[in-house]
Amino acid sequence: MSRQWMTLMAILLVYIPVAIDATVLHVAAPTLSVALGSSGNELLWIIDIYSLVMAGMVLPMGALGDKIGFKRLLLLGSAIFGIASLCAALSPTAMTLIASRALLAVGAAMIVPATLAGIRSTFAEASQRNMALGLWAAVGSGGAAFGPLVGGILLEHFYWGSVFLINVPIVLVVIAINAKVVPRQPARREQPLNLLQALVLIAAILMLVFSAKSALKGQLALWLTALVALGGAAMLTWFIRKQLSAARPMVDMRLF
């Protein structure tokens, strides 16, 4: 097997748990409710925080990869993903599990752009690169589809933390393989990181989602729910204005 396809296998191996973790807890709500004494609202955050934080962090992590090189970003993201998985598996309360899932999302947000950059730098020929990207997309959709199945099997035979603990040996193997196989990509120091804008975007998303969930459940006073929603909308508006005025925006708003 050529080095190109070995590199692709290593990249896909690290991407599998990232995709699975997006949906692996969808069947675990009853188990988590009993084991951690989680409320309905806490269960929603345990499940949703991963996708919400990852969505907000992918773009700045891509910029970070430009600064430090995407191989380093891949190894750093894998290490954070493994540590967060261990913390999640050992979480004693719902709040610590939510925090661990948020950290897990940060690691995942590093891995996603790093894998795409690795594919782009590994396959110079367009037809091979397109095939590699197709396999990457298939692994992502397949991992998300099989997440509930994997979660159900593990919960049937082991304790709830096993859905996270299984990531740890995978990450250790992946780090060893990728450190040796994946080529180093050159860093581009001039790429702005815009971490503040990324944090504002995440805060805006979380506030808007929180206000929507609170409105549906009636947990907060209507005026307070509206205030949180307005705060989230104001932050989102500020983020969009910054992107429109930036010379090198994280998101090119003209595409929408």
Task: Enumerate the predicted regions with their spans.
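Hydrophobic transmembrane-helix bundles of small-molecule transporters
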Residues: 156-255
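Helix-loop-helix hairpins in multi-pass membrane proteins, especially solute transporters
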Residues: 66, 70-196
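Primarily residues marking transmembrane-helix entry/exit sites
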Residues: 1-12, 94, 194-199, 203, ...
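Short helix-kink/termination motifs in transmembrane helices of multi-pass secondary transporters
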Residues: 14-28, 53, 70, 163, ...
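Small-residue-mediated transmembrane helix hinge/kink sites in multi-pass secondary transporters
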Residues: 30, 62-63, 116, 151-152, ...
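Extracytoplasmic
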Residues: 3-51, 111-112, 116
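Residue-level signature of mid-helix packing/kink "hotspots" within the transmembrane helices
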Residues: 23, 54-59, 144-145
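Hydrophobic residues within membrane-embedded alpha-helical segments of Major Facilitator Superfamily
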Residues: 13, 17, 24-29, 58, ...
